[in-house]
Amino acid sequence: MNELPFWKSKTLAEMTAAEWESLCDGCGLCCLNKIEEWDSGDVYFTSVSCKLLDGHSCRCSSYETRWDFVPDCVQLTRENVPEIAWLPPTCGYRLINEGRDLYWWHPLVSGDPETVHAAGISARGRTINETEIDIDDLEDYVVDWPLTVGEEKNEEEA
């Protein structure tokens, strides 16, 4: 029998906890500090990572207890994914919510957690940890690459 993978046959709301967690591709882009303009609501990514982001794996170093260290960490949920406009265009949660498929480099498709890095999608090698800068200088680190990663590869959806 040729069953479809869960991300092609279920909505976000129908996924198990394990399926939900596996949608994270490990890019680390959601763990970059962002600046929001109060008057316009525009959100800008920076190349400054959360203090808990492991710069090599692009995963949280204290995932289960992150709120003990970063109380304002945004937890992605079935309810808030549709409302979070700053999710990168390559984000698995965003793609599935929009009825799209995962890209070829997503670990669920490739079977390899390194493909997100090899494809140049992740934050690996592009960030500085927030503990290494003066947070008052955050605007000096504004970048647009989190919103454009993978553009030349976007036609290669599985």
UniProtKB/Swiss-Prot annotation:
It holds the Pfam family CxxCxxCC. It comes from the Bacteria. InterPro entries: Puta_zinc/iron-chelating_dom, UCP006173. HAMAP family: UPF0260. Belongs to the UPF0260 family. PANTHER family: UPF0260 PROTEIN YCGN (PTHR37421:SF1). This is UPF0260 protein RHE_CH01262. The lineage of its organism: Bacteria, Pseudomonadati, Pseudomonadota, Alphaproteobacteria, Hyphomicrobiales.
